Amino acid sequence: MNQEIMNLFNPTTPAQVFDQIRISIASPEKILSWSYGEIKKPETINYRTFKPERDGLFCARIFGPIKDYECLCGKYKRMKYKGIICEKCSVEVTLSRVRRERMGHIELAAPVAHIWFLKSLPSRIGLLLDMTLKDLERILYFEYYVVLEPGLTALKDRQLLSEEEYLRAQDEYGQDSFTAMIGAEAIRELLKGLELEKLEASLRVEMQETESDIKHKKLAKRLKIVEAFRFSGNKPEWMILTVVPVIPPDLRPLVPLDGGRFATSDLNDLYRRVINRNNRLKRLMELRAPDIIIRNEKRMLQEAVDALFDNGRRGRVITGANKRPLKSLADMLKGKQGRFRQNLLGKRVDYSGRSVITVGPELRLHQCGLPKKMALELFKPFIYSRLDAKGLSTTVKQAKKLVEKERPEVWDILDEVIREHPILLNRAPTLHRLGIQAFEPVLIEGKAIQLHPLVCAAFNADFDGDQMAVHVPLSLEAQLEARVLMMSTNNILHPANGLPIIVPSQDIVLGLYYLSILREGLPGEGKLFGEAAEIEHALHAKVIHLHTKIKYRWEGLDENGKQVSRWYETTAGRTMLGQVLPKSVKMPFDVINKLMTKKEISGVIDQVYRHCGQKETVMFCDRIMALGFYNAFKAGISFGKDDMVVPASKWKTVEDTRTLAKEFEQQYNDGLITHGEKYNKVVDAWSKCTKKISEDMMTEISAVKKNPKGGEAQINSIFMMSNSGARGSQDQMRQLAGMRGLMAKPSGEIIETPIISNFKEGLSVLEYFNSTHGARKGLADTALKTANSGYLTRRLVDVAQDCIITADDCGTKLGIKMRAIIDAGTVVASLASRILGRTAGEDLRDPLTNKVVVKRGTLMEESHVDALQQAGIQEVKIRSALTCELVNGICGKCYGRDLARGTPVNHGEAVGVIAAQSIGEPGTQLTMRTFHIGGAAQINEQSFIESNFDGKVTIKNKAIAKNGEGHLVAMVRNMVVAVTDADGTERATHRIQYGARMRVDEGDMVKRGQRIAEWDPYTRPVLTEVEGIIGFEDLVEGQSISETLDESTGIAKRVVIDWRSQRGGADLRPAIVIKGKDGKILKLARGGEARYMLSVDAILSVDVGAKVKTGDILARISTESAKTRDITGGLPRVAELFEARKPKDAAIIAEISGTIRFGRDYKNKRRISIEPVDTTEETREYLIPKGKHIHLQDGDIVEKGDFIVEGNPAPHDILAIKGIEELAAYLVNEIQEVYRLQGVLINDKHIEVIVRQMLQKVEVTDQGETDMISGEQIDKIEFDQINAKAKEEGKKIATGTPVLLGITKASLQTRSFFSAASFQETTRVLTEAAVNGKVDPLEGLKENVIVGRLIPAGTGASMAKIREVAVKRDKLILDEREKQATIVPSAPEPEPLALPTPEQS
């Protein structure tokens, strides 16, 4: 209590108002100005009296008193002596809190290098002096002397001399003829002697003169650091310390334990070592000890200071008494337990509790059940104040007693207090913002929190022992925000994809599905009913059944909102659903007059939300939840063993496949196919078999059976559960009653022998053993992937945290093009789904009438999208975060619709964090879901193209040949088949693979679903373009070709082997040539000879002397064997894309359009050049490693951006060759691909936001007449600013190219050093920032959390805006007053205007 009174007299200093924070190197003078006194002794506190020793590490004279307002000796006590310094013990009488603020210092007897600037790479001292780290360490740790002033001697400036060389030089030249020093003093002198202006000028000159690339880079680095020191006002010699600051004692406490021992912070030990060694050095210097001893002591001092700043950075780690490394100052900041992440970004909060959750089906959507005991504890302060207000208690003590006794009036007051006071529920792990939601508490008995079933999906909660935490928002503002922004009723849509997340699942779905079933031939079929009451009566009287087909008169509203009645053919159950539907024009009975699966219900909720608003949706959800639960209970659905129907056709299918597998085995034995092909084909056959059995099982289970009376029998329960989406997937049913199918090895390869049994029949021992792989891998993956996914989310949040909506419209004309994504003939993502909720980037016109359908700048709602679909528009230009031109943040138009609200996005919305959560959250979900299918292998390989539309075929770059078998074969790589409709609009374009069999020709009409082309997905062919006779070149047995006898078959097959590794094979160039009748090599139409180069591992399909027709296969190259894909391959893939890593076998991409020419080969590289079509460009050369299959031949024509060597393209190449839009499309599609495989929907805009953050930097290619350095990476914004300035001054501007940074790199290079330091590599970031004297503008979220302010997003953004307005207005008023004061000096003083506070405004 008296603490509070004291605080009244000592008002806390108001919080400083600042806009930015600067970090720089502390000069010795600065350190002394912070200090309150020098620490001379290593003692801490007296172990008997527990009082701090004078001049020691805890000295009260320097740091302040231990008890409030009491000096150490006790002469002065109490407030009245405030500020007096006791003459006996020299301690100032003040608050003990100053011991957290006051610093001390240690005067070093010899200067010491700061290890961060020495060892944190790149070494700043090393760069400035242009010395290697090794040499620096030799000088600093007293091994070598360095020459500072060579004088007239033959020594060079900065030459290193060992002890003997130094002594010899002194003898030779005389002691005073040159100056050489050793240790940190020497380095300090060198740094002091640097003339930065001159150095910078000479470096710039040198850079322009140098030819070598490496040297240029090194000079650029030096120039950058020289500039940094010049502009930041830091002096280079400050990197050498002469004074060491000592942090306040309360930040490195020493606590006495019982038994006379002490627990102490490691820093005290480290400081003690420094002080001991420093004092010893001082004494030795006073005693004029021999040089060698002093030098050793100086080296030890340097090591002690190194350990204090960053223990373990150099040399041995210094350990404490228990062999544990001591935590140095750097370790205090670093890592998860460091100051940044533990205390500044993650704080513990008061007023919280946690308990187990149970289900609360009778709650409303905005409620949760809170145990009375918890409520009483959490709302204590409110209860106390209420008791006081009601006069039931006069003091807090009394109130406490009342509450502890749990008097009846306390419960009444608790009810009052809780009413309309929202509380927050949180379930860890909080992967996205829906992991914390606000509810109104309902008091319940018991000890478990009750949760509404519909919000479980958002929390990812279930009731198998999950726990949740409760938090109480205290202030009125916090309560308001909780109610308006976080209430569960305000979070109906998922921020990741805009679909409802308040969706019934499991029992509710099953109940609703059961309710909406329609079965033929039930009693009472065809009866007419006028209203719901009649139906209810009939049901009770058992005249009709829930599923009976009846006629029903439904009363609704027509388009004009008038009452209308219509007859519907429906069932009794569906009329019940009709009762809970909101009455609206847009909600006819048709919406629910169908079989309700989970997907359908989700659709209905979505429609209700779009047409009837939020309130109706919430009420509707609550009603259908009750209906679903009730009917699931009434239906009493359960299943027995016989409900799992094994299809009758199973064994026949299995036998057929076995025969097929045997055939492939035989073909392999006969040498017709390779081992790899056989493997692929067998695996393929079995997966087809599994699929067929699965389909047969589904048809048998779902078949409508008749009962003896001629009516329909009950529907199979398992089918009902799976079909409704309540529980279980088709895959799980297949494993129960079909066949388990193929299994994967832990390495990801598929085992050739499948598991033929299902769980109903039971597995054989071998099958069981084979299936253990998948199950174990699943469990192991789960553990590993959770961590990986969490780390990915953290990196994403870090890179995107300062992406905030800061304006309505940036006014850009740019945008990106969107079209539907089609894969293997199926539409994977429709154009409609991709452009919904985005802003049109141009006027969209109907291709037939040329009428504008959607104006530029319109936010596309559902109605617009429908109009576009009807007009048949295939491609739409939309605004995107990638092309937004705002300097800070993103504008609302470029972002589009706020997915979680379904409205245009608000100012201050933290879209970056939402994007990161949306991408990261399913990562964890998926990783936890790998083993749901028990590792059953799923293979997907595309091997054909189907038309999605009816239309006419047109072929671009046509080159088709008829081969020996009479099939049409595609002969080029850039052939495109387009399907056009009647009026000539292109509906679809397909790139045709080389060697594909064409099923259509130019001008053919195709129907939807008709095959256009097909190919073997497992091999790549080499085709002949001319008819003739085969000849071999350089195909030498044992050198470039090996005829392998397959052990199992005894049949020879010829494979090209690596000829460069064989003796005498370096100059071979194996190829197949086509000769004419005269034995000469034929010429090709496109120039060049008919010579086909072969790569390693090619399998020959022809023999010397054989006749071939155009389009015949000469050789085949096998592709990789099929691996299973699941998100375990997926998560690393997503990380790889976001980190912009170069893939393992990167594709080589043509940088220009032109003709391929093969050059001379190197030892193990093959040289290819492209002769450009455009003669102004120069020829590009590529060196391709051996063993890579180049599927191009001499003289082929390639387009810019085509692949020369297959593989995954490196994102950097795409950016360089095709530009930003292509890169964005590639990244978005590749990432979406991974998530789509798992059935996860994420809106493209989230990925675009992250990609925008990866493209923030520009690499300067030509510096022009600016201060930038060519080759350096600089922020896009800074780059533009510098260029604008140069333009104003009429100088030549710099040019640059956009650079793609991975998310980790981008996070570390943000403009805010606070954000970067709290992310990773804290030491490096802080060192760099200090050298550059960086200023943190505090724009992002993290920086503001760290300095303890409101974040500039959400309500914080509007507060900041109001404050800005207020400051401007105040300034105007004050300026006005000053003017008046200067005009009329004699006038009486005006009344002060009442300035409204920012809050009022």
UniProtKB/Swiss-Prot annotation:
CDD domains: RNAP_beta'_C (cd02655), RNAP_beta'_N (cd01609)
Assembly description: The RNAP catalytic core consists of 2 alpha, 1 beta, 1 beta' and 1 omega subunit. When a sigma factor is associated with the core the holoenzyme is formed, which can initiate transcription.
Example of a GO MF term: DNA-directed RNA polymerase activity
Gene3D superfamilies named in the record: 1.10.132.30, 1.10.150.390, 1.10.1790.20, 1.10.40.90, 2.40.40.20, 2.40.50.100, RNA polymerase II, clamp domain (4.10.860.120), RNA polymerase Rpb1, domain 3 (1.10.274.100)
Enzyme class name: transferase
Region described as Disordered: spans on this chain: 1378-1401
Name of the protein: DNA-directed RNA polymerase subunit beta'
